[in-house]
Amino acid sequence: MENIMTLPKIKHVRAWFIGGATAEKGAGGGDYHDQGGNHWIDDHIATPMSKYRDYEQSRQSFGINVLGTLIVEVEAENGQTGFAVSTAGEMGCFIVEKHLNRFIEGKCVSDIKLIHDQMLGATMYYSGSGGLVMNTISCVDLALWDLFGKVVGLPVYKLLGGAVRDEIQFYATGARPDLAKEMGFIGGKMPTHWGPHDGDAGIRKDAAMVADMREKCGPDFWLMLDCWMSQDVNYATKLAHACAPFNLKWIEECLPPQQYEGYRELKRNAPAGMMVTSGEHHGTLQSFRTLAETGIDIMQPDVGWCGGLTTLVEIAALAKSRGQLVVPHGSSVYSHHAVITFTNTPFSEFLMTSPDCSTLRPQFDPILLDEPVPVNGRIHKSVLDKPGFGVELNRDCHLKRPYSH
């Protein structure tokens, strides 16, 4: 009889943060909104707060970057560690160190589903259907997968059953789809800059932006719009039809997450051939089931916000059973290892984090070391062939650990 590998137990869990409201300057990292000045990601992008003129020009003006980056590290009895990052900052540190630690320490490194279910159940009364608590749980879950992969010496995608394709092809999200085309991406997704409070003039301005990019990019390059929860059904429908002559591939997250009936109506009234997508700010498997039932074409969970890799795998299976695509919100290595195993994820998102979109920069820079970026718009599976998620923690980022246990 062959010997079965004996796996160690988890000895410690620790939580740090960088950036956020108490930082002197933008720190980047897991909270990619936490950037310095003159960055496209903070330049008059339409949001639910745009109707208030004081908060229209900058998303940082209403506090989009106050949380900062949460870093969770789990250490096994043998000294090996796994870690992950997300958006939850100092408050996430409190949740990990003062509540979730009891479900982690003492468990076997392979007990990921058990820990996940206990974290969900224990926080249900104060987590709702997403947000800060779910971000924190997601970060712990990802750290556990990283540790498990490092202990057994396998990349996470092989723990999930292996790749179903040789490479991942990407579209780029940023202000310059024309530059994304030059870099080899298959498409470019732009933020909208106007909303219902701007009336028909706002629709004309965003449609003109799409028309301009269509002229620059040619007829076949994908163009998409990210509306970031800033619209209502009427406005979104009118904008979709205004952009239809320019072959807009999809219109994304037009409505707040809870407006399921609105998404159903938008899908029903959208131009033929134009896809309706959403899911970035949804958390929990149950919310994605409701979203799937609206009939949208692509669900876009963020693996760092929806419940982690454990939940993302469940969402992908749910979508597959309904013939829907899952294209996760850009999450770098944490989504790369998942999507290369999903048959219903034919492409993925890469978020441009350089200020003017002119260069490729790792999404979670500077907190991750050895974080890969696409080459000619693609990442080959061989790039992912390192234990765990294949990245290391940059401990020179002035990590702060505000709590302990």
UniProtKB/Swiss-Prot annotation:
The keyword Metal-binding applies. This is L-rhamnonate dehydratase. NCBIfam families: PRK15440.1 (NF011968). Belongs to the mandelate racemase/muconate lactonizing enzyme family. RhamD subfamily. The gene is rhmD. Substrate binds at residues 33, 59, 349. The keyword Metal-binding applies. PROSITE patterns: MR_MLE_1. GO terms for biological process: amino acid catabolic process; carbohydrate catabolic process. Keywords: Lyase, Magnesium, Metal-binding. It catalyses: L-rhamnonate = 2-dehydro-3-deoxy-L-rhamnonate + H2O. The record marks 302 as: Increases basicity of active site His. The active site is at residue 329. Binds 1 Mg(2+) ion per subunit. Reaction proceeds via a syn dehydration. PANTHER family: ENOLASE SUPERFAMILY, MANDELATE RACEMASE, MITOCHONDRIAL ENOLASE SUPERFAMILY MEMBER 1. The record marks 349 as: Transition state stabilizer. Catalyzes the dehydration of L-rhamnonate to 2-keto-3-deoxy-L-rhamnonate (KDR). Homooctamer; tetramer of dimers. InterPro entries: Enolase-like_C_sf, Enolase-like_N, Enolase_C-like, L-Rhamnon_dehydrat, Mandel_Rmase/mucon_lact_enz_CS, Mandelate_racemase_C, Mandelate_racemase_N_dom, RHMD-like. Mg(2+) binds at residues 226, 252, 280. Its EC number is 4.2.1.90. Its cofactor is Mg(2+). One of its GO terms (molecular function) is magnesium ion binding. It comes from the Bacteria.
